[in-house]
Regions:
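Protein kinase glycine-rich loop
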Residues: 54-57
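Conserved ATP-binding subdomain of kinase catalytic cores across diverse folds
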Residues: 62, 67-69, 74-77, 82-193
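ATP-dependent phospho-/nucleotidyl transfer catalytic cores
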Residues: 87-91, 147-160, 175-241, 246, ...
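Active-site activation/catalytic loop segments of kinase-like enzymes and analogous catalytic loops
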Residues: 273-317, 333-352
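Active-site acidic catalytic loop and adjacent metal/ATP-binding pocket
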Residues: 59-68, 74-79, 120, 224-274, ...
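Cationic, low-complexity basic patches in intrinsically disordered or flexible, solvent-exposed regions
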Residues: 11
Length: 396
């Protein structure tokens, strides 16, 4: 009798949740859409908002598309909530953002180029952002038409175009006037600091997970030497992107050319090698960064060659011999660094990166460390590729 009652209760609960869960999610979606309409109305948009949708799969900010109707035209905008838990000074960040985009736009106009850059849409009070009643910071940029992003390149030309676009981005910003940009995340690519944070996370074991990942901890400890291979203070300080994943470059849908670099929150003073290395990490790999089938994770030397070619074509004249001399090692360092960050976040209870499933950060760690091993096996070939493409450049 008791078992029958238990089964009946489970059935009732299942039916109840089956009925009400869709209603709950529908109510939450309607509440979110209402908020997005309200926030969007705080900006100087052309036309009135007729629809919105969630956009992208970023790990930090929340992003939405706004569709605005203005007489006979349809205008699209990108609305983002700046994660002020990650970016502690959103106003300073938006000052960086505005300065960088104005400078890039001026360069594009001066060169009469067909390239694009993000353009900030001011709030109704004239600022580059809106702060809502809950203390959240929001910004709007014009949607860039005609471009497409890729998590993994479909061919080596896409990797070449992305590398060329990032090199042009660095080169265009090399003469930006004014005070240095704000460090939106201090020590963002301080690999030594990332290692020490990882070691502390292992020792504290706040989430009780370290016993599950002993092999990964050992792997990271064995490669501590990588933490000191590229120190920012040993290289020229440049205005760099700091998050140069392949999908942060829009490639033209028709021509395939790199047309716009996006996701500018971490643009700040830094080392060009970190930008180069992070692009290689995402573009010269046969899989996405959270691939669960590790047999698919491998480094692609041929694609690396295309990246070196594109980057040297646009940024080679800017780089000095020390930077070029570390182009082979940079991808290993940045891959190790990101693996450390994912592992640290897992040990701390998944508090920084967005996770979409149990063990998501762990999947990311395993994929990055597998990629690192593949890079280590290809290091000599990478060095030969750099020598081949740098031979024609006059280095400072």
């Amino acid at each position: 009798m008791q078992g029958l009652f238990k089964k009946g209760a489970q059935l009732f609960l299942g039916l109840t949740l089956g009925v009400f869960y869709p209603l709950i999610f529908q109510a939450l979606a309607q509440q979110t859409e209402s908020l997005i309409y309200e926030i969007g109305a705080q900006f100087q948009l052309e036309g009135h908002i007729i629809s919105t949708e969630v956009h992208g799969n970023g790990n930090v900010n929340d992003t939405f598309l706004l569709f605005c109707e203005d007489e006979d035209s349809l205008n699209r905008y990108t609305l983002q909530r700046i994660n002020h838990e990650v970016f502690k000074d959103p106003e300073g960040l938006m000052n960086n953002f505005s300065r960088v985009t104005r400078h890039l736009q001026a360069k594009i106009e001066e060169e009469r180029s067909s390239k694009e850059c993000l353009r900030v849409v001011s709030a109704r009070d004239g600022r580059a952002f809106h702060r809502d009643s809950d203390g959240n910071f929001w910004r709007v940029t014009r949607f860039v038409d005609g471009g497409r992003s890729y998590d993994v390149p479909e061919n080596d030309r896409q990797a070449y175009e992305a590398a060329k676009a990032y090199g042009e981005f660095q080169a265009k910003l090399s003469d930006m006037p004014g005070e240095p940009l704000l460090d939106t995340i201090p020590d963002f690519h301080n690999t030594r600091m990332r290692f020490e944070n990882f070691r502390t996370a292992v020792e504290r074991d706040e989430a009780g997970r370290s016993s599950e990942v002993g092999d990964l901890v050992e792997f990271a400890l064995e490669r501590e030497f990588l933490a000191d291979k590229i120190k920012a203070e040993d290289f020229p300080v440049r205005v760099v992107h700091n998050d140069t994943k392949l999908n942060n470059v829009l490639l033209h849908k028709s021509t395939g050319e790199g047309m716009c670099v996006v996701d500018l929150d971490t643009v700040m003073p830094g080392c060009a090698l970190h930008d180069f290395g992070d692009l290689v990490r995402t573009a010269a790999c046969a899989s996405v960064e959270d691939e669960v089938d590790l047999d698919k994770v491998r480094f692609l030397p041929e694609t690396y060659g295309s990246i070196v070619e594109g980057y040297m074509e646009s940024a080679g004249d800017m780089l000095d011999s020390r930077e070029v001399g570390h182009l082979a090692l940079a991808p290993l360092v940045i891959t190790y660094e990101l693996g450390l960050r994912f592992l640290t976040d897992y040990l701390e209870g998944d508090v920084y990166f967005k996770v979409k499933r149990p063990g998501h950060n762990l999947d990311r760690v395993r994929a990055q460390f597998k990629l690192l091993v593949s890079m280590e096996e290809s290091l000599e070939e990478m060095e030969d590729i750099v020598l081949r493409f740098s031979a024609t450049k006059s280095l400072a």
